[in-house]
Structure formats: C-alpha cells, structure tokens
C-alpha cells in the first residue's frame, strides 16, 4: 500500500540530488547564457602559460641547446614517442593534436593545485582547475571522438564502417555503443579524478594544519600528471585503432 508514496519520495530525492553543486560557482550572464566564469578565467591562464612557453621555445633556437630548449625538446620528443607508439607509422599529422590535449590537461590539472586560489577575488566560489568541471572534460573528449572517426574515414573511406559488423553482424549494436562510450569514459574519468583530488585537499586543509595535507597535495600533483598521460594515451590509441582496424 505504501509502495507508491515511497517511490514518489525516492524520485523526489533523486531529483533534489541532481541539483546539488559541489562548492560555490560564479557565473557571467552573457545575453541569455550563463557562462562558468571560474572555468574561463583558469582556462585563459592555462592558455596564456602554454602560449608563452611556446613563444619562448621557438623564439631563439640555438645550435647548442640551452637548458630551457633542452626541456622543450624533451617534451616534444615525449609526445612524438607517445603518438608513434599508439598510432603507428602514420603518427606525424596527429602529434599536434595529441600534444595539445596532453599539455592543456597537464597544465590545467596542475593549475588547480599550484595557482593561488585567492589571487583573483570572485563574488562566489574560488578558482579551480578547468578539468574539475564536467563541461571542460566533455569538450576535450568530443574532439577526440571526431578525430577518431576522421582518422578511420581518411584511411579507409566508407570501408571503415565495415568494422561494426566484425567479427559477426550480431555485434553491430555493441560495436556502435562502444564508440559512443569512449568519449564518455574519457570525460568522466578525468573529471572524477581531478574533482576528487581537489575535494580531498580542501577537506584536509580545513580540518588539519597546513603541513599535514602537503603529502596529499604532492600525490595530487603526481596523479594529475598521470591523468593527463592516460587521456592522451587513450586518445592516441583510439585514433590508431580506427586506422588499423577493429580490435
């Protein structure tokens, strides 16, 4: 007799839970749209850091490289090796894409831990890593999905779609679903890990003295770098898979 009221209360509870936000957020009202200002501000800082670093890297190259030039060359070589390992011999055109993804995510993740959050006073909330917002991670995953299809169609033409009926046509729905779940897994993995890391640090800082959370902060820096590497590696692997065939 009480099943219906309980079901209604459960649905109401789930609806209320769906409106919960983690922390306070500051929005800009532009026309009829709400823009997440915290994400934009930190993203602009990250982009400025990357553009400034790229300008320094190519401004005055030396025959005998300096320490900074050695560092940038090492980063480029690392990205090239990563792309070649996952994509294969046709990795060249994809190095800029994989490199952009890796560097933006890496610097974004670290910005949440290293940039002083009080450096910019906001009416609500504080600055945080762009990647702790689901909109950012989805925006990074969708171009990866587009690149995945583009690489396969460029290499194989319409024959690319034949992979969906391999090894048997019965697997057609599963193979189609697999392609749509790849960007979801990329975005939610990155979002969940970065958000959880920042929440743990915030809670520890509020509960205990500053010295105690420092090891956790260093662990967060390490895991942030690992998350950037995982995202870039999976993106390159998906592109390589679409060019080589179904696995």
Curated annotation (Swiss-Prot):
Protein family according to the UniProt entry: Belongs to the ATPase A chain family.
Keywords: ATP synthesis, CF(0), Chloroplast, Hydrogen ion transport, Ion transport, Membrane, Plastid, Thylakoid, Transmembrane, Transmembrane helix, Transport
Xref: SUPFAM superfamilies: F1F0 ATP synthase subunit A (SSF81336)
InterPro entries, per the entry: ATP_syn_F0_a_bact/chloroplast (IPR045082), ATP_synth_F0_asu (IPR000568), ATP_synth_F0_asu_AS (IPR023011), F0_ATP_A_sf (IPR035908)
GO CC annotations on file: chloroplast thylakoid membrane; plasma membrane; proton-transporting ATP synthase complex
Segments passing through the bilayer: 38-58, 95-115, 134-154, 199-219, 220-240
Keyword Plastid: yes
Oligomeric and partner information: F-type ATPases have 2 components, CF(1) - the catalytic core - and CF(0) - the membrane proton channel. CF(1) has five subunits: alpha(3), beta(3), gamma(1), delta(1), epsilon(1). CF(0) has four main subunits: a, b, b' and c.
Pfam families the UniProt entry points to: ATP-synt_A (PF00119)
Localization, UniProt: Plastid, Chloroplast thylakoid membrane
Protein's name according to its UniProt entry: ATP synthase subunit a, chloroplastic
Membrane topology annotation: Multi-pass membrane protein
Organism: Drimys granadensis
A Gene Ontology molecular function term of the record: proton-transporting ATP synthase activity, rotational mechanism
Designated gene of the protein: atpI
Annotated NCBIfam families: ATP_synt_6_or_A
Domain of life: Eukaryota
Role noted for this protein: Key component of the proton channel; it plays a direct role in the translocation of protons across the membrane.
Main location: plastid
């Amino acid at each position: 007799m009480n099943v219906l009221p309980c079901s209604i209360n459960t649905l109401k509870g789930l609806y209320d839970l769906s409106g919960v936000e983690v922390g306070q957020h500051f929005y800009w009202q532009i026309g009829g749209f709400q823009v997440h200002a915290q994400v934009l501000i930190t993203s602009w800082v990250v982009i400025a850091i990357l553009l400034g670093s790229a300008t320094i890297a190519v401004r005055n190259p030396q025959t005998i490289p300096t320490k900074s030039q050695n560092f940038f060359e090492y980063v480029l070589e690392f990205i090239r090796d990563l792309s070649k390992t996952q994509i294969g011999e046709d990795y060249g055109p994809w190095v800029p894409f994989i490199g952009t993804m890796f560097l933006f995510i890496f610097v974004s993740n670290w910005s949440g831990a290293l940039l002083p959050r009080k450096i910019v006073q906001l009416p609500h909330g504080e600055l945080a890593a762009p990647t702790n917002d689901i909109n950012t991670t989805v925006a990074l995953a969708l171009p990866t999905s587009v690149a995945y299809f583009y690489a396969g169609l460029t290499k194989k033409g319409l024959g690319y779609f034949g992979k969906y009926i391999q090894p048997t046509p019965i697997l057609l729905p599963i193979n189609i679903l697999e392609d749509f779940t790849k960007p979801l897994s990329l975005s939610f993995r990155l979002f969940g890990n970065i958000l959880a890391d920042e929440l743990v640090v915030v809670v520890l800082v509020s509960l205990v003295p500053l010295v105690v959370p420092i090891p956790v902060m260093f662990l967060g820096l390490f895991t942030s770098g690992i998350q950037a590497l995982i995202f870039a590696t999976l993106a390159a692997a998906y592109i390589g898979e679409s060019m080589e065939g179904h696995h």
